[in-house]
A protein has these predicted regions:
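Non-catalytic accessory regions of SAM-dependent methyltransferases
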Residues: 1-41
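Conserved hydrophobic residues forming the short capping helix/wall of the S-adenosyl-L-methionine
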Residues: 12, 107, 155, 227, ...
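Conserved AdoMet
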Residues: 30-105
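Short loop/edge segments at beta-strand edges and connector loops
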Residues: 73, 165-167, 241, 265
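Conserved beta-strand segments of alpha/beta enzyme cores
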Residues: 82, 137, 161-163, 259-262
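Conserved Class I SAM-dependent methyltransferase catalytic core
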Residues: 84, 213-277
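Conserved SAM/SAH cofactor-binding pocket of Class I
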Residues: 95-195, 222
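Mobile active-site "lid"/loop adjacent to the S-adenosyl-L-methionine
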Residues: 187-219
């Protein structure tokens, strides 16, 4: 096994760096063997079977083409859960995990909350909130059939109660009221693609990532319009945002009638989250 580990590190570190390479290697062995880091240390002197070596070689070949490890294994870790992900559905990010923590921390003492997650993707936000907000009723929307299928799988896998609905928000008039509306919509500017990693550009769904430079707040504007109709009194709107557009978004929401608008920084110090109340 030591030789295999050394080969993985030798091939991956020049592309991914040491920290990410080590994380990828742990994911490979968790996927193939169910091992954690302690298990890897215990078995480091073991001889891997020819079958296992062949499987690792296949995974390595895909990684060298910059395919995300989450699409290779079909899983992504999010908020303590192993969620299903597939090509066509955005891989959950650590920053989104931070957004979930903010929402839980600010609403943990409230019960029977009605929650709407817009642009749910894999369902990661909706499922994490359903698991952590007591007796909450959670609904999740997406227009993508691929996302809806994956979100439904994740609801079943995690045994959570989340209603998943296929819906284009630009052609939707909400009939229900919600205490919390949350969204991590597409927010990366088309022009930012020039500086993005190849594994994101070549494999992840562009429609879940990018917005036009000449209309960067389109999703936020529409979701805010929905929130004005659908938020209960004292309801809260939460967004994950593009730091480049934080000030512009805050100004837009205030003009739309949201009086309490607050931004939060992520663990890297970037303005990444926003809360608004009417």
């Amino acid at each position: 096994m030591k030789e295999t580990l050394q080969k993985l590190r030798t091939d991956l570190i020049p592309i991914y760096g040491k920290g990410e390479s080590d994380a990828i290697i742990r994911l490979i062995f968790h996927y193939l063997k169910g091992w954690n880091l302690t298990d890897m240390l215990i078995h480091q002197d073991d001889e891997l079977s020819p079958f296992m070596k062949d499987e690792i070689d296949k995974i390595l070949a895909r990684l060298l083409k910059m395919e995300p490890i989450q699409y290779i294994t079909g899983e992504a870790r999010f908020h303590g859960m192993d969620l299903v992900v597939r090509p066509g559905v955005l891989i959950p990010r650590p920053e989104t995990d931070e957004l979930v923590d903010i929402i839980i921390d600010e609403n943990k003492d409230r019960e029977d909350l009605s929650v709407l997650d817009v642009c749910t993707g894999s369902g990661c936000i909706a499922i994490a909130l359903a698991r952590n907000l007591p007796f909450s009723k959670v609904t999740a929307l997406d227009f993508s059939k691929e996302a809806i299928a994956v979100a439904l799988e994740n609801v079943q896998k995690t045994k959570t109660h989340v209603r998943i609905i296929e819906q284009d928000i630009f052609n939707w008039d909400p009939a229900e009221k919600y205490d919390i509306i949350v969204s991590n919509p597409p927010y990366v500017l088309d022009s930012e693609a020039l500086t993005m990693e190849k594994n994101v550009l070549d494999y992840e769904p562009h429609e879940a990532l990018f917005v036009r430079d000449d209309n960067p707040l389109a999703y936020y504007r529409r979701i805010a319009e929905i929130a004005k109709k659908a938020l209960e009194n004292n309801g809260k709107l939460y967004f994950e945002i593009n730091p480049l557009k934080a000030v512009e978004l805050e100004e837009m929401l205030k003009k739309m009638g949201f009086e309490k608008v607050e931004t939060y920084r992520d663990s890297y110090g970037k303005l990444r989250f926003l809360k608004a109340e009417l």
